């Protein structure tokens, strides 16, 4: 594959509908991934500003092409789905996110929109609140007693953390106010004081446990513990500032400000900095004052939230898809400091991604000592943003530069500016490595991507464990008794470094002595070796899938296997295609044949050729092939009753396994799909068939029992 410079993202006005559709798909996937990292994993991967830029471009494209708007788009949803491990809780009133303002003008525009919507001549009273950087929480009280606590989750469904919340001293188990609704959902933010965070991290480090990146992550991670005792040991705090369902309000003509006072009477801690403003100037003055005090505050804030004070106005204003019209968040710029970038190191992730990391002269940013900063990728170093537009006015980053570092969103240290006046005249530009620093294999960058990846999939130590886990997975070699746990153990001991090593374990066991391992004995070792031997004969599609080539899943592996038919033909074609690679592209007949396979295309074809262009991969595969036999593909029949038909299997099958049914259908020339559509020809329904059966009936698709299917295929 040829490395190509990332081109600037096209102006939205110039986007065609097909290109807009592709970019929306890319943006939605990126945002969903970052939402999961933030809301589920408590480990954000990019700065708030970069995330906000992705969202703004998504929303702008959707505004131009409203017909491409999807109900599942991040612009229409909030947060991320609840993580596994906690019971799910449905919020009676959704916990939506807030729209953002990034300038004084945008705050003024927010107030003007409110006035126009309500047809007011005067500016309505606005409550200004510090935006606490923590974890949103909803508390349900019935007859004044706490009955349930839930995280925000995706805004509609959260995680039940009631037991953990009962350990937080700031949260009353019984409301104390004179007037208490029969049922109410009270909301706020779980957070950790800065000095408590530093003390916790010190204890974690001394104990050899994970240290947290910032107070927000520590608060979220502490609350979402399966062991309540761990949560109880953590110094969590809570500010109350909102509510959801209320069976009745505890006052006549309620306002935001009055409700906050009631929350204080009920036993909650309410932020003492909250201020009632009567003009845009008042609101902006509060923003600047609290911003100046930010470093001295005992807790982290990342902005100010403005809310219309009168609740009847809030009710009239209502909501847009994912945020209220009556509130907006005014974000702070990140805290910054100046230091020297001493070195750029390259880290290799488990998927082979080469990620540059800046090693800095230690500097304090926002009260935290920073020594490293993310550089994201080659484009970021060169001064090119994630959307192709210039970063830092297009100025690149070099080893030895004096740089401005910020903790973006008080989370991830990031280089935002280079001080060019201090750059030595002879300082060379940084050259991103085109070889993996771990294994020496060449690195490749796909067109349209910013990431360079190591192509030494089978031999790179940085990727080895994940690749080996994939190699023995169910759809690959599927070796009984050799799962993830065993792979990790054998790799740590140096016994299995590449796939061929699995098949030489038996021959080496006189030296290794697997039977001496804890949990093993002569019988279990004998059974393991028998299971390995049983997989010395493998179907071509399973082998191709097992190689872990990027973009080659189960379906593409089958397409390749059917096209080439045998391992010898496949290898000869791949070697010829790899030899045809040139800086100008690949015009070899072998590559064109690969690229023209129905369902493959450029992206998959280039990934396959990159794999075989790396000699170390070929060497590892040759070593594997000396230990196994690859079975030729049984060509699908074309003269059967189901040849060319699309079939979906659903429900519990009793006469064959799902894999057996799928394989039999494919041998007879049918295409097996995972979902029902108008293009589906048959749905084979077993016991307890659910939504797929219902959809098939709604669409008029032919539904067969197992017996009817067997009769059809003879």
Curated annotation (Swiss-Prot):
It catalyses: NAD(+) + (deoxyribonucleotide)n-3'-hydroxyl + 5'-phospho-(deoxyribonucleotide)m = (deoxyribonucleotide)n+m + AMP + beta-nicotinamide D-nucleotide. Its EC number is 6.5.1.2. GO terms for molecular function: DNA ligase (NAD+) activity; metal ion binding. Gene3D superfamilies: 5' to 3' exonuclease, C-terminal subdomain (1.10.150.20), 6.20.10.30, BRCT domain (3.40.50.10190), DNA ligase/mRNA capping enzyme (3.30.470.30), Helix hairpin bin (1.10.287.610), Nucleic acid-binding proteins (2.40.50.140). DNA ligase that catalyzes the formation of phosphodiester linkages between 5'-phosphoryl and 3'-hydroxyl groups in double-stranded DNA using NAD as a coenzyme and as the energy source for the reaction. It is essential for DNA replication and repair of damaged DNA. The keyword Protein transport does not apply. It is an enzyme of class 6 (ligase). InterPro entries: BRCT_dom, BRCT_dom_sf, DisA/LigA_HHH, DNA_ligase, DNA_ligase_AS, DNA_ligase_CS, DNAligase_adenylation, DNAligase_N. Zn(2+) binds at residues 436, 439, 454, 460. Pfam families: BRCT, DNA_ligase_aden, DNA_ligase_OB, DNA_ligase_ZBD, HHH_2. One of its GO terms (biological process) is DNA replication. The active site is at residue 131. This is DNA ligase. The lineage of its organism: Bacteria, Pseudomonadati, Pseudomonadota, Alphaproteobacteria, Hyphomicrobiales. NAD(+) binds at residues 48-52, 97-98, 129, 152, 189, 307, 331. Its cofactor is Mg(2+); Mn(2+). Keywords: DNA damage, DNA repair, DNA replication, Ligase, Magnesium, Manganese, Metal-binding, NAD, Zinc. Residues 637-714 form the BRCT domain. GO terms for cellular component: cytosol. The gene is ligA. Belongs to the NAD-dependent DNA ligase family. LigA subfamily.
């Amino acid at each position: 594959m040829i490395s190509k410079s990332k081109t600037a993202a096209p102006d939205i006005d110039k986007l065609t509908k097909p290109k807009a559709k592709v970019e929306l798909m890319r943006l939605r996937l990126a945002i969903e991934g970052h939402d999961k990292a933030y809301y589920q994993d408590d480990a954000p991967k990019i700065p708030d500003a970069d995330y906000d830029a992705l969202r703004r471009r998504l929303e702008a494209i959707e505004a131009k092409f409203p017909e491409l708007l999807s109900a599942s788009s991040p612009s229409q949803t909030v947060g991320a789905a609840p993580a596994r491990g906690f019971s799910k809780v449905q919020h009676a009133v959704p916990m939506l996110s807030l729209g953002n303002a990034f300038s004084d003008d945008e705050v003024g525009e927010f107030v003007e929109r409110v006035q126009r919507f309500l047809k007011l001549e005067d500016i309505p009273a606005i409550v200004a609140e510090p935006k606490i950087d923590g974890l949103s929480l909803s508390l349900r009280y019935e007859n004044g007693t706490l009955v349930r606590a839930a995280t925000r989750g995706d805004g509609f469904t959260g995680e039940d953390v009631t037991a953990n919340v009962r350990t937080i001293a700031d949260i009353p188990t019984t409301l104390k106010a004179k007037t208490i609704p029969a049922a109410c959902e009270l909301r706020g933010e779980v957070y950790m004081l800065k000095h408590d965070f530093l003390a916790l991290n010190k204890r974690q480090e001394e104990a050899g446990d994970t240290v947290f990146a910032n107070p927000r992550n520590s608060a979220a991670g502490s609350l979402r513990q399966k062991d309540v005792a761990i949560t109880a040991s953590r110094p969590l705090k809570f500010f109350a500032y909102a509510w959801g369902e209320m069976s009745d309000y505890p006052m006549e003509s309620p306002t935001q400000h009055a409700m906050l006072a009631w929350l204080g009477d009920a036993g909650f801690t309410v932020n003492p900095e909250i201020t009632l403003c009567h003009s845009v100037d008042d609101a902006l003055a509060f923003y600047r004052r609290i911003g100046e005090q930010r470093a001295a505050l005992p807790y982290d804030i990342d902005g100010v939230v403005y809310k219309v004070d009168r609740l009847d106005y809030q009710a009239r204003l209502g909501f847009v898809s994912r945020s209220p019209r009556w509130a907006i968040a005014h974000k702070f710029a990140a805290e910054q400091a100046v230091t020297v970038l001493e070195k750029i190191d390259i880290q290799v992730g488990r998927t082979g991604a080469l990620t540059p990391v800046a090693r800095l002269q230690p500097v304090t940013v926002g009260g935290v000592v920073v020594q490293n900063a993310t550089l994201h990728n080659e484009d970021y170093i060169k001064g090119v943003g994630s959307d192709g537009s210039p970063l830092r006015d297009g100025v690149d980053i070099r080893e030895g530069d004096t740089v401005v570092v910020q903790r973006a969103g008080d989370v991830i240290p990031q280089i935002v500016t280079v001080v060019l006046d201090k750059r030595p005249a002879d300082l060379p530009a940084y050259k991103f490595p085109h070889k993996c620093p771990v294994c020496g294999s060449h690195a490749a960058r796909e067109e349209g991507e910013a990431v360079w990846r190591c192509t030494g999939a089978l031999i790179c130590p940085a990727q080895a464990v994940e690749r080996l886990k994939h190699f023995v997975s169910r759809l690959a070699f599927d070796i009984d008794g050799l799962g993830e746990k065993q792979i990790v153990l054998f790799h740590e001991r140096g016994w299995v470094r590449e796939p061929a090593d699995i098949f030489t374990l038996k021959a080496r066991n006189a030296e290794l002595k697997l039977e001496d391992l804890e949990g093993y004995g002569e019988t279990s070792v004998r059974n393991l070796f028998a299971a390995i031997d049983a997989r010395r004969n493998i179907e071509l599609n399973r082998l191709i899938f097992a190689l872990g080539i990027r973009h080659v899943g189960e379906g593409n592996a089958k397409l390749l296997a059917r096209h080439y038919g045998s391992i010898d033909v496949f290898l000869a074609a791949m070697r010829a295609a790899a030899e045809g690679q040139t800086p100008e592209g690949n015009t070899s007949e072998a590559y064109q044949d690969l690229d023209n396979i129905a369902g493959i295309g450029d992206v998959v074809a280039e990934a396959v050729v990159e794999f075989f262009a790396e000699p170390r991969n070929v060497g590892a595969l040759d070593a594997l092939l000396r230990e196994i036999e690859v079975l030729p593909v049984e060509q699908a029949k074309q003269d059967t009753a189901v040849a060319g038909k699309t079939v979906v299997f659903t429900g519990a099958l009793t006469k064959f396994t799902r894999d057996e049914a799928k394989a039999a259908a494919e041998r007879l020339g049918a295409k097996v799909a995972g979902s029902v559509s108008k293009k589906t020809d048959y749905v084979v329904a077993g016991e307890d068939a659910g939504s797929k059966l219902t959809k098939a009936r709604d669409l008029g698709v032919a539904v067969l029992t197992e017996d009817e299917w067997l009769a059809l295929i003879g």
